[in-house]
């Protein structure tokens, strides 16, 4: 059975886009009305209306994902969608004309094969998306369901395999046009160095007096940090976590302490209530202390075994991969290779972890088991020191050059296409969308 979807709202769009009049029109003739013409290429009213429907459908889906309202009956919303679609078709017509002028509009056999493969992938992706959103409860067989969704996409969205193929061809043609436009665009070494200096100064301004932010950026996977502040250490850890049942017992007892404290802090609590809350808090604290002691006792042997293995010469990384219960130290994680970046007084880490690390004297030192009320036991390795100062230019030069070149190429291409659109002799009849 097909689920109710946003299409129910969008079925009214053709009426909104072509308002009712007392004069009845032949639907086929009306749909064939030219809206845009450039040379011998045209875009009809039917095509515009279908594209606007699709544009608004996609926007409605996007807004719905974030629980935002998107009123498909709002004239301003409709007008905005129309403008977006019309500008896209003007750009497309100008590009097609230029591709033909440059002799780039014909595909080779290899390019045609690539277009077909891309079209099939795109069509299947759209089919799967609609299957998931609108046909999730369908009991139809696979082939029958595929046929129904294919028909649905054509009727409701104006999307067919032929359209997917034409779109894929257009992408390849535009790629050829773009290559011809940007082939002479370059970036000099001086420009790369200037960009490097700018990024270094920006990073220095951001991080020189805020090592915690640098550490957070590093630990979160920021690919390139152009300046490293002083005082950053790298640390790996073998975390021995509390047993689940012990963690649950501590959480329950802690909740009782918090509840009793809330009564003590409340201005409208009576003396009798406060007296009872004091007793409840004391009992809950005793319960919490006992639960915590039991929790540590239940993991003491595991932590001691790790320390014994290390004392016996076990390889740290091998043992960490086997024993640590910290996901950040799992094989394949960047932080497992380098260690966490940590600075003193860093609040995004447990203070027991930070203090334990900075109590170690030299790189390579390993702590004893360090008790954490939050997680269990930390066994910490002082892995290294981050080198203060800017990242080496040679290590980022290639990436910087690529980034600058891509940005410049896109700017040159966009400006060039905008010029083609501006210079094109379009014939427009936008009034036909209103009657």
Protein language model regions, located:
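Short, low-structural-confidence N-terminal segments
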Residues: 1-83, 87, 217-229, 244, ...
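N-terminal targeting/tethering segments
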Residues: 25-165
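Extracytoplasmic
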Residues: 30-38, 80, 187, 230-237, ...
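Second-shell loop/turn segments in exported
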Residues: 33-39, 71-86, 97-106, 154, ...
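Secretory-pathway/luminal and periplasmic proteins that interact with or process carbohydrate-rich
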Residues: 121-133, 203-207, 326-334
């Amino acid at each position: 059975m097909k689920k109710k979807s946003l299409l129910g709202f969008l079925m009214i769009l053709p009426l909104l886009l072509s308002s009712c009049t007392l004069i009845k029109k032949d639907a086929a003739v009306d749909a064939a009305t030219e809206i845009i013409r450039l040379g011998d290429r045209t875009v009809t009213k039917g095509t515009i209306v279908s594209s606007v429907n699709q544009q608004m459908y996609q926007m409605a889906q996007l807004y719905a994902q974030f629980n935002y309202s998107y009123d498909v009956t709002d004239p301003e919303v409709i007008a905005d969608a129309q403008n977006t679609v019309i500008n896209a078709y003007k750009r497309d017509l100008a590009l097609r004309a230029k591709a033909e002028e440059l002799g780039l509009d014909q595909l080779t056999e290899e390019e045609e094969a690539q277009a077909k493969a891309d079209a099939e992938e795109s069509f299947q992706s759209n089919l799967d998306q609609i299957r998931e959103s609108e046909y999730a409860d369908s009991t139809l067989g696979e082939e029958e369901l595929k046929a129904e969704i294919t028909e649905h996409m054509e009727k409701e969205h104006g999307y067919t395999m032929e359209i997917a193929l034409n779109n894929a061809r257009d992408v390849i043609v535009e790629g050829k046009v773009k290559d011809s436009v940007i082939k002479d665009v370059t970036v000099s070494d001086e420009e790369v160095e200037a960009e490097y200096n700018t990024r270094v100064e920006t990073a220095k301004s951001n991080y020189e007096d805020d090592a915690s932010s640098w550490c957070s950026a590093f630990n979160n996977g920021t690919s390139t940090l152009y300046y490293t502040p002083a005082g950053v250490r790298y640390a790996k850890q073998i975390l021995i976590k509390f047993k689940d049942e012990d963690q649950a017992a501590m959480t329950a007892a802690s909740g009782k302490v918090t509840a009793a404290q809330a009564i003590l802090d409340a201005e409208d609590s009576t003396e009798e209530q406060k007296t009872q809350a004091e007793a409840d808090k004391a009992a809950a604290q005793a319960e919490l202390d006992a639960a915590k002691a039991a929790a540590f006792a239940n993991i003491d042997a595991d932590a001691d075994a790790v320390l014994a293995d290390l004392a016996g010469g076990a390889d740290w990384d091998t043992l960490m991969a086997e024993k640590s219960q910290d996901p950040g130290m799992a094989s394949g994680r960047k932080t497992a290779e380098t260690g966490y970046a940590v600075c003193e007084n860093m609040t995004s880490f447990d203070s027991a972890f930070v203090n334990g690390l900075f109590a170690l004297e030299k790189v390579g030192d390993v702590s004893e088991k360090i008790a954490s009320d939050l997680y269990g036991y930390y066994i910490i390795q002082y892995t290294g020191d981050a080198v203060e100062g800017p990242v080496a230019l040679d290590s980022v030069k290639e990436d910087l050059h690529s980034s600058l070149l891509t940005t410049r190429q896109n700017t040159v291409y966009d400006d060039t296409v905008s010029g083609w659109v501006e210079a094109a002799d379009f014939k427009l009849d936008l009034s036909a969308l209103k009657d």
